[in-house]
Amino acid sequence: MNKKEVIEAVAKVFADKISELKSSLEGTRDRARDAPGHNVSHSDTSRFQLSNLALGIEKQVVEYEEILKQIKGVALEPADKISVGSLFTLCDTDSDEEKNFLMLYQGGGEKITVDGVEITTLSITAPIAQACLGKETDDEVKYRNNTFEVTEIL
């Protein structure tokens, strides 16, 4: 795995999400501006509801922009221990199935494929991320009823 390529791919995912949200935000604002307000009809709250929706989208944009900044700031040098910014592989000791992760402060749950390898982003607050923090290559990670071995840290 090439850590730089993975970081670039994850950054693209979040940049694309930001672009989609901004487009959605623009459309929502337009609809809110054109919607009837409560002055037109006592039972119509479309403008209010659309305005609230726009505020929610704005918050998501800000969150994703913060995540994107953090992703772009991830160190490319390999670390000895798993920490925020680590790209690492866990191998299930029972099934020998390997899973690849990129640990971030925020933005967990995204699955991307780089050169045919699936990588899942982990938020540092995720229980499995907490179990992995500070582990080194060949260490065991116990999560739920499974045991994993750390096989690679980049």
Segments and roles (model prediction):
Residues 1, 7, 29, 36, ...:
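Mixed-charge, polar/low-complexity N-terminal
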Residues 55, 59-97:
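Long amphipathic N-terminal alpha/beta scaffold segment
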Residues 47-48, 75, 128:
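Generic hydrophobic-segment detector
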Residues 30, 37, 41-44, 73, ...:
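Generic preference for flexible, low-structure residues
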Residues 1-65:
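Helix-rich terminal scaffold detector
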Residues 150-154:
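Conserved hydrophobic positions within beta-strands
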Residues 80-142, 148:
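Non-DNA-binding regulatory cores of transcription-related proteins
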